[in-house]
Amino acid sequence: MPLQYQSGFGNDWATEALPGALPAGRNSPQRCPYGLYAEQLSGTAFTAPRAENRRSWLYRIRPAAQHRPFEPFDGAARWLSDFGAAPVTPNQLRWSPLPLPDAPTDFIEGVQTWGGNGGPGEHGGVGIHLYAANRSMQGRYFYNADGELLIVPQQGRLRLATELGIIEVEPLEIAVIPRGVRLRVDLPDGQARGYMLENFGAALHLPELGPIGSNCLANARDFQTPVACYEDIEGDFELIAKFTGGFWRAAIGHSPLDVVAWHGTHAPYKYDLRHFNTIGSISFDHPDPSIFTVLTSPSDTPGTANMDFAIFPPRVLAMENTFRPPWFHRNVASEFMGLIHGVYDAKAEGFAPGGASLHNCMSGHGPDADTFEKATAADTSQAHYIRDTMAFMFETRRVIRPTAQALASAQLQSDYYECWQGLNKHFDPAQP
């Protein structure tokens, strides 16, 4: 049976897998229907402003506290939160796609950290990861106490069985798992690869639209949150926790995905990037890439995000007498890019689906020589249709510190800088 979802963003949801499982008129009755336990999951402080407050009430078969003591877990050794172990270079960096594993590897085992900043203790910054896996999580569940997860599949579907219901995402869709939500990751296609951002800061929001108006970019109605769905199974399972940068394991005698009903605002969701309503210039110039923002994590500085997630989807370029590709740039923010599908319009070669690039604070970047020559000779009286593409960017206010494993990776392209060396000198003071 097809999975069911609730439509909207930031709603106060209410859903039950059994009729009457949600208590009427109160959150914590003396006795819950069906003999369930009431439990609140708080994603923000109790006193956070109402518009920012994130919490959900769960009605579950057993409380989340019921498990054996945690002990250290070493099965996620490549998922890191220490971003100060390797020196930071101002060089532009690019990587080829991560290969799929040969040995059996589930999602938790297959995460590899490529860089980040801040950390769980700062309640700010991000971790940037790649993942490659070839088996579903077996007898294992996971939650992240350090931050929310933004998952960007590039190859293969993910079935995210969470406490609050089931989400299935495919390439060109994204999923967000809030801080603390327990889940199991299954691979319907047998293997999967993609990108993941770990947000240590404020929860992701839709960006303000300002003069754009009340519509466009990612519209709230296109986000989907799961309906209640529970597992009532007993056995020898393990619960993996990411806590203050480390990983911990606890034995648990039942599935923790046993929430029969829930209501609230702290919940996972998915979004189809193909629904993004792209905005662009219909006169001249290429606008700033902020017009492509899907989600943003605000910081304590107005107008400056902890992190932005932007995409570069299929679109029509109609600007006349304009250099249409993304322009040459140096940015106070740091930019990590990935390619989900197709070709990125600023790079003719070398940036493949599943690959990644990093342009840190004030490191010059922009179109390669081939792209520049073609764009400066193009007929801009005709519209240009970019159809076969889906690139994305994680942009952060802080420098992204690459990990030692990213810098030592066989996928690192040591010749990336060469893509700009072919840019010719055209300056002639006698020819305005």
From Swiss-Prot:
Query: GO terms for biological process?
Result: L-phenylalanine catabolic process; tyrosine catabolic process
| Residues that hold homogentisate according to the record | 344, 365
Report the superkingdom from the record. Bacteria
Record's keyword annotation contains Phosphoprotein: no
Q: What class of enzyme is it?
A: oxidoreductase
State which Enzyme Commission number(s) the record gives.
1.13.11.5
InterPro entries documented for this protein:
HgmA_C (IPR046451), HgmA_N (IPR046452), Homogentis_dOase (IPR005708), Homogentis_dOase_bac (IPR022950), RmlC-like_jellyroll (IPR014710), RmlC_Cupin_sf (IPR011051)
Q: Which UniProt keywords apply?
A: Dioxygenase, Iron, Metal-binding, Oxidoreductase, Phenylalanine catabolism, Tyrosine catabolism
Q: Which cofactor does it need?
A: Fe cation
Query: Nucleotidyltransferase as a keyword?
Result: no
Catalytic activity, per the record?
Answer: homogentisate + O2 = 4-maleylacetoacetate + H(+)
- Signal peptide start-end: none
Q: Which residues are annotated as active site?
A: 286
Q: Name one GO molecular function term.
A: homogentisate 1,2-dioxygenase activity
Its cellular-component GO annotations read: cytoplasm
The pathway that the record names for this protein is:
Amino-acid degradation; L-phenylalanine degradation; acetoacetate and fumarate from L-phenylalanine: step 4/6
| Residues the entry annotates as binding Fe cation | 329, 335, 365
- Report the family membership: Belongs to the homogentisate dioxygenase family.
HAMAP family of this UniProt entry?
Homogentis_dioxygen
Q: Which PANTHER family match?
A: HOMOGENTISATE 1,2-DIOXYGENASE (PTHR11056:SF0)
Per UniProt, subunit arrangement is: Hexamer; dimer of trimers.
Q: What does the UniProt record say this protein does? A: Involved in the catabolism of homogentisate (2,5-dihydroxyphenylacetate or 2,5-OH-PhAc), a central intermediate in the degradation of phenylalanine and tyrosine. Catalyzes the oxidative ring cleavage of the aromatic ring of homogentisate to yield maleylacetoacetate.
Q: What is this protein called?
A: Homogentisate 1,2-dioxygenase
Species name: Bordetella petrii (strain ATCC BAA-461 / DSM 12804 / CCUG 43448)
Gene name linked to the record = hmgA
